[in-house]
Amino acid sequence: MRARSSPASRLTSAREPPFFLPRRCPSRCSRGALRRRLTQRWGGRRPDLYIDYTKALLRPDFAVSAQNCWTGKGGAFTGQITAEMIKDVGLGWVLIGHSECRHTIGKGEDNAMCAAKVKYAQDAGLNVIFAVGEKKEERVGGTTEAVVAEQMKALLDAGVTGFGEGLVIAYEPVWAIGTGLVATPDQAQEAHVFIRKWIAENVSAEAAEATRIQYGGSAKPGNAAELAAQPDVDGLLIGGASLTPGFIDCINAFKCKF
């Protein structure tokens, strides 16, 4: 996990991201890397029904995030929640673009819809964790970078800003989510380097250095330390492993990056 201006990982609070884990900073680290490290905190995303309950149990330095939001303020969209509702219950973060929203639920959310949600959430004053990643056939076909680049480009097309500030990127290879498979540390680092390079080339070098990039694909206690050792893995977007006592081991694995 890197230090940015907000928290990170599965729990989040009013100006900080969900479950973020720290980032290793070598003895001589860049100004952006140092900034990322100094601003990291802990956070987590909770189902909407349990937000108040979760907030009541946590210390103030833990941030709580919603898991999704709709694309606008209102309308006939039964079952959806708006960014304004999220803010109204005291949250400062929302997760957008998770693979299950993109590929599993209903007709799925395409790149344009996910990006529109990010823009709307930002305009409402929320920080965003934006998930990107490729499916198995795209990984096998060698199009991982092209797929991720299109997902990132949609943000700029929608007028999204905040790279290095209230926008966190979470790389989650779809083929590794809930499957027991996991990208190797080298594969995770490679993807994170590509994302950081993309931001440098399309936004700015400063934004690239300051942007937190999490890894989320069957991250668990058994691989957390190896992932933490990668210089561009700034934190973890943890799913199933966050429901077990071993979750604390994932947190401890990233203490080297504080």
Predicted segment positions?
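Active-site loop-to-helix "anion-binding N-cap" substructures in soluble metabolic enzymes
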Residues: M1-F258
